[in-house]
Amino acid sequence: MVMLRSLLVSALAALAAASPIAEPADQSLEARQLGSSNDLTNGACKDVTLIFARGSTEMGNMGTVIGPPLCSALKSKLGADKVACQGVGGLYTGGLMQNALPQNTDPGAISTAKSLFEQASTKCPNTQIVAGGYSQGSAVIDNAVQQLSAEVKDKVKGVVFFGFTRNLQDKGQIPNYPKDNVKVFCAMGDLVCDGTLIVTAAHLTYTINAPEAASFLASKVQSA
């Protein structure tokens, strides 16, 4: 375990030190500057609610690599007035060491994400929920969806993962959730997707997948 933790710290330090990937120019000022979005907790109900969990060490509750670009792309697909974007904050700190835990994140992070799904369901009973997670955030969403009640889980129409840390363990899907409603993006050379905790440059390239991921989520909402 000591060796694993040492490897984890040295490998994931690259993520903390890396310069953010350039983001689309049409993102909201809030997302660009703060890496956060609280449309669900602070705003009015929308037709679609995106719940997103950022990667380790990323700023805000949406991060920078893929969270804000995904939100922006989904709003472009479905209409800015139709989509609420909500990042997972609270007890999810995005710390490095949590990646080495059995669920590849900690119980507090999972509980925080789960509560957001439940809030979307109760506060906005007519909203269609979609979700996404990057790096450690993919484990947060994966585990949270598994813990949802059948009623809430049925409202989750689609999930996208980027650099899925549980890709090998969960066979590219979320246990007990429709496989066709999950799309996993694993860049060539991203060893995180192979069941390791080794971060390579490929792990930081997922910004380019925002349009395709948004199209997938939009298709699930529109076909529901």
UniProtKB/Swiss-Prot annotation:
Record flagged with keyword Hydrolase: yes
Signal peptide (residue range): 1-18
UniProt-listed Enzyme Commission number(s): 3.1.1.74
Subcellular location, record wording: Secreted
Sorted UniProt keywords: Disulfide bond, Hydrolase, Secreted, Serine esterase, Signal
Site residues (Transition state stabilizer), renumbered to this chain: S56, Q136
Pfam families in alphabetical order: Cutinase
Entry function: Catalyzes the hydrolysis of complex carboxylic polyesters found in the cell wall of plants. Degrades cutin, a macromolecule that forms the structure of the plant cuticle.
Similarity remark: Belongs to the cutinase family.
Protein name, UniProt field: Probable cutinase 1
